UniProtKB/Swiss-Prot annotation:
Leader sequence residues: 1-30
The protein, known as: Platelet factor 4 variant
Covalent S-S links between cysteines: C44-C70, C46-C86
Keyword terms of this UniProt record: Cytokine, Disulfide bond, Glycoprotein, Heparin-binding, Proteoglycan, Secreted, Signal
Note: Binding to heparin is much weaker than in the close homolog PF4/CXCL4.
Family named by the database record: Belongs to the intercrine alpha (chemokine CxC) family.
UniProt xrefs under InterPro entries: Chemokine_b/g/d, Chemokine_CXC, Chemokine_CXC_CS, Chemokine_IL8-like_dom, CXC_Chemokine_domain, Interleukin_8-like_sf
PTM statement from Swiss-Prot or TrEMBL: The N-terminal processed forms of platelet factor 4 variant seems to be produced by proteolytic cleavage. The most abundant form is Platelet factor 4 variant(5-74).
Binding site for heparin: K95, K96, I97, I98, K99, E100, H101
One of the Pfam families matching this protein, by short name: IL8
Source organism superkingdom: Eukaryota
Organism: Homo sapiens
Amino acid sequence: MSSAARSRLTRATRQEMLFLALLLLPVVVAFARAEAEEDGDLQCLCVKTTSQVRPRHITSLEVIKAGPHCPTAQLIATLKNGRKICLDLQALLYKKIIKEHLES
């Protein structure tokens, strides 16, 4: 095989490899994004909690159980003004509210 033929073969091989790499690039990006989104879900929503909210200002409560995303349970209150805040699960007042809610 002549050097010119070898050069054309090498160039064709490089072009094919580049074409394959360009085809695979979106797949790699999609996998990277999916992993980043999954990692983003694995965290506690409640970084800071409060025990200074009066029950009459609360319109709804959401309890998120502890799991792989967060080692502690989380209590999220929606207030009448639409704001969401995290309540301290150890506060006696909120323990009482949860108990009453579960009994009803």
